[in-house]
Amino acid sequence: MPKIVLEHVTKRYDRFYAVDDLNLVIEDNAFVTLLGPSGCGKTTTLRMIAGLETPTSGKITIGDNVVFDSEEGINVPANKRKVGFLFQNYALWPNMTVYENISFGLTNIKEPLPKINVDARAEAGLLKALKAPNEVVKIVNECYDKKGKLDENKAMIKLIDAYELSQYSAKKLLGYKLHQSKDAKAEAEKLAAELEKQIESARNDAKAKGMELNEDFVYTNNGEVVKEERKLTKEEIDLAVRRVSRIVKIGMFMDRYPAELSGGQQQRVAIARTLAPEPTVLFMDEPLSNLDAKLRLEMRSELQRLHLETGSTFVYVTHDQMEAMTLATRICLIDNGDLQQYDAPLDVYNMPDNLFVADFVGNPAINFIDAKGSQEKDGSFSLDIFDGHKVRFVPNDKIDINEWYANSNAQDQKKADELALKASEKGYVERGNKEKAFKYHIAKVDEFEDYGDEVELTENDFVLGVRPEFINISDKAKLKGEIYSSMPTGMETTVRVAVGPYLLTGVMFGGVVYKIGDKANVEFTGNNVILFSRKNSKFITLGKLEVE
């Protein structure tokens, strides 16, 4: 499967930059989720890769093919990019059966394809089934109802799935009536001998024309596959439909109409239709958002399995961070048209690049705590939190905060210089939706809008990020508080603890019940507390937090 590369891709609507200077590499066979709030540019990015939206500038490469290049004037149409697109709405034809919906795109394909002896290939499929006649008989006998009548449709579906046959070959196999024969083995051997003769005859005919039939019954000439511009045959279309129906488990619904299916079944049909032409890349734009919570969870599991079985590259758009965390091999988090972080899900969760990423990923949300202080000689940080509580932050890895700020400031200056250079170029349009500092939320007992003056921040201002699972309630803890709310959900309970005017959210495991108003002492466990710069919102390091 191909690698996808985006280089300096920008999409602008007048002064609004939907996507700004995006650089991204999606490795082959990856499952990448484009994550972000509504209107951040994730769907625009997906549509540009698929060819449904034309970028303002930049370059997009799929595999070895450049599909868009603003400088070279290249823009390959969507139907030539060999990609599949799965939409939020299933977009199934209501007047067509499931089979007709899946096969619809296949019937319109006309392009140079390998020349195949379809009859010989079908005969080879039957020959494979006849090598195990007792198994065929067993499958058919399982399809008799209580009245002793054979359910031919059920028998055909089972034969199709067992031997990967088309419906035409399965019908022929059922027509041999091995299940009614006194000696199924002898009858199968007789039929197999006849099929072998026909296959050998097809090979001889190919040789007479100066060609050969390979193992897949594709015509070759001097080892090269012979191609011809043609449409897919009925046999090829049916095999493709049956192949994808096996993957998404909808073989029994082929004769039904969309209105007769549940939401989950309709989504499976839409997935099968997208997979049928064997796209090199599969794009999905919030495909599960119309399903209820239980079905959404089930379909997430199916999509994981689908990715493994097809070996395709998946690019998936969602605003649901739970979907992104559970499905993706890498998360591409976008906000206001800018790439915020591109990493493995656990790296995004544990080591967010900035305050926005930390806030967006995680449920319940991360606890932010304002802190002020400085680094000590031993490398730890002596900080004040919660209006006077003294804490000590011990980094996991050695870090010099002055050196960190010097590197960070140099990066910011380089970015500013690049923007100034771009602004001086002819045709540059100033960005209307400029990047703004993220306003993180400090949870308090009495919430109110703060209209006071902006605080002048220094390099001694920090923000601590503590995930709810690292908040613990213990009698031995030094930070005193009381239970503000308690929400048990079985084996875990989400608790909010008031520490003075501030609120901390924790997740307690083991089915413990807490009573609102009870005293509760809080401590910070583990070494995954995150230290951010309050001045520039960037991630500094991970460490442990000790209350003094």
PLM region descriptions:
Residues 100-104, 108, 223-356:
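ABC ATPase nucleotide-binding domains
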Residues 171, 377-548:
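Non-catalytic connector elements of ABC transporters
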Residues 59-61, 65, 338:
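ATP-binding/catalytic-site motifs of ATP-hydrolyzing domains
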Residues 67-84, 108-120, 127, 131, ...:
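ABC ATPase NBD coupling module
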Residues 35-37:
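The feature captures the beta-strand-to-loop junction immediately N-terminal to the Walker
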Residues 5, 25, 61, 521-523:
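ABC ATPase nucleotide-binding domain
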Residues 50:
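Helix-to-loop junction immediately C-terminal to a conserved catalytic motif
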